[in-house]
Swiss-Prot record:
Polar residues bias (residue ranges): 27-38
Subcellular location: Nucleus
Basic motif: region residues: 193-211
Region (Leucine-zipper (atypical)): 222-243
bZIP domain segment(s): 187-245
SUPFAM superfamilies cross-referenced by the UniProt entry: Leucine zipper domain
Residue numbers covered by motif Nuclear localization signal: 193-211
UniProt-recorded name of the protein: Cross-pathway control protein A
């Protein structure tokens, strides 16, 4: 195959009257239109490509996209086909390529009844019985046992006035004995310091106990006043009822 000369072919391409077009463009400097440039790249690729060259069609034959490119579909179609590029890609790819052309008519990847389990009827009945509230009936009547001894007369319940929980439980307050005097060696500085700390702790504890006793007496007084106010309220309420009748 002869090497084409672009400078000589320009008069025929552009229908020029003169053949000096190539002479005007020819110069010692190598350029795109100079006959001095190597024109091997204008020849077909099959002649200059080495035997081990792989075409892009062979690279994309397995429908795998290069890792450094981005495509609209999951992969690139063959180069000899127009290809169908869309943004409605789906991970479900049929190897036979017999999918419907309308994506809305495809079968769902996650069917609603795909995870349905067959439940035992006995288990359903048991669950329904557990969810039903139990019927609440009247409380059972206590059984009164007859005894030979006469029943004690009903005595009025004692008021809470001046009554402590410890007294009802049979627990009496411990009688506190007077503490012994603090003895220490006046020649020992550590013993003197320990004695002063002990005396300060005793005074603090005594003040705390005194404060606690005052609070207990105040609570008893308030409870007594509350009980008296309740009694007065009941008295005047009963008087109002008798007056209206």
């Amino acid at each position: 195959m002869s090497t084409p000369n672009i400078a000589q072919d320009f008069p025929e391409l552009f229908d020029l009257q003169s053949n000096r077009f190539g002479d005007d463009l020819s110069s010692p400097e190598s350029n795109m239109l100079s006959p001095q440039i190597n024109t091997s790249f204008f020849s077909p690729m099959g002649e200059v490509a080495p035997p081990g060259t792989v075409s892009p069609k062979d690279l994309f034959f397995d429908a795998s996209a290069p890792p450094s490119t981005t495509f609209t579909d999951l992969s690139t179609p063959p180069l000899d086909t127009p290809g169908f590029f869309s943004q409605n890609t789906s991970p479900m790819i049929n190897t036979e390529m017999d999918l419907n052309a309308v994506p809305e008519e495809w079968e769902s990847l996650f069917p609603q009844d795909g995870f349905s389990l067959d439940l035992d009827s006995a288990a359903l009945e048991l669950a329904a019985s557990l969810q039903q509230p139990k019927a609440t009936g009247p409380p059972p009547t206590p059984v009164i046992r007859a005894s030979a001894s006469p029943a004690p007369s009903a005595s009025p319940a004692p008021s809470r006035q001046g009554t402590k929980h410890s007294t009802v439980a049979g627990v009496n307050a411990r009688q506190r004995k007077p503490l012994p005097p603090i003895k220490f060696d006046s020649a020992d500085p550590a013993a003197m310091k320990r004695a002063r700390n002990t005396e300060a702790a005793r005074k603090s504890r005594a003040r705390k106990l005194e404060r606690q006793g005052e609070m207990e007496r105040r609570i008893e007084e308030l409870e007594r006043m509350l009980e008296e106010s309740k009694q007065r309220e009941e008295y005047w309420r009963s008087m109002a009822k008798t007056g209206t009748n």
